[in-house]
Amino acid sequence: MKRIAILGGGPAGAFAAERLASAGLAVQLFDEKLAWEKPCGGGLTYKAYSQYPFLVDNDIPKRFVRETVLAAPRAGEVCVPLSDPLVIYSRLDLNRMLLDRAERAGAQIEKTHVSEVRWQGSAWEVRTPFGTADADFCIVATGARNSLRNLGTQLKAGDTMSALGYYVPGEQARIDIQFLPHLEGYIWIFPRCGHLSVGICGKGEPAGSLRKRLERFMSERGISAKGARFYSHLLPSLDASSWHENRVAGEGWMAVGDAAGLVDPITGEGLYYALRSADLAARALLSEKIGQYRRLLARDFAADLEFGSRLAKRIFLGRFLFGAVPARMVQFTRRSPRFSAIMQDLFAGRQSYQELKRRLLRNLNGSLYEIAMSLGFSRLVPRKAG
């Protein structure tokens, strides 16, 4: 029986463990902390739970969010109804559920620190404070702060973004997204079970500066940070030039989730890509087509994330029709049903970045017409003779 060592017990590692153990492989999962919280983590799109229905068909506490409010300077705000709701868990609860599923499938869960992983030519030696374990193959799921230098992606300074936030008492039904000037990122308010997650993510700006932006926003909204729990996390956010050299596999190993750099460079979403990459890695291993893993990732979603990395700066910092792109996005969503439908599909995960430009151009004339009509220009359009 093939022996598999999974290094990391987050969603990617836990799901890979379940998939491989269910197929009859001997799986050991090593993680120092196991289930833990993240600043915003726990949000699942329709794309995720439609492919993996167990993500909603369970008794774990969760929130179904059916509207998002987008806001930008000089544009006000707009409500985007979500026909396919976002599902929000406590990341702690979601991670614990995935680990429980892995254990029920037969995986051996080890709460311990991995001090060293050594390739012995035909097998791995995994060292922990309690001894060593041997494995024929390694799945690397150690997250963005991967201490195993020879395994997983190699993040450069420009390949990360900071995410930080507070858990504060409160209740609301919607998600708030606030764009800010000169920020390649955004502020969020996510409703959770029993509290709110108020946070910020941004690329190319120090965490201290992001925290000041967030606390200024919270003060303006009347949200107190006093006594609130603070969290921070590093997210992969690969530059366009980094995707082609992204190290996702090697002799005797594959990386999944954040450890493979597989995070949406625009939204910062990583949960779907953690689960999906774990699934694809398990398939490649079980079919003994490990060399095809990179190709499977590219065909499934990585090529789209690479394309998204080229769009990110233009979306957050670019200009269109003499205004900032985020402001135009809010205004177009408010005035154009066509554009609002595009935004809904983006939130659901149905709209790829590769097809986004074509869809926007295809709908541009119609969207501009709808905007003109909504602004009162219908009075200037001659009516057809009845």
Question: Which role does the model predict for each range below?
Answer:
Residues 116, 132, 206-284, 290-294:
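FAD/FMN-dependent oxidoreductases across multiple families
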Residues 13-14:
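N-terminal Rossmann-fold NAD(P) dinucleotide-binding loop
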Residues 1-10:
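Beta1/beta-strand and adjacent pyrophosphate-binding region of the FAD-binding site
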Residues 4, 25-27, 138, 175:
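Hydrophobic anchor at the start of a short beta-strand
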Residues 9, 101-228, 244, 261:
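Predominantly flavin-linked oxidoreductase catalytic cores and closely associated redox partners
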Residues 283-386:
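C-terminal helical "tail/cap" subdomain of flavin- and related membrane-associated enzymes
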Residues 21-40:
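Glycine-rich FAD pyrophosphate-binding loop
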Residues 44-97:
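A conserved beta-strand/loop capping segment in the N-terminal third of enzymes
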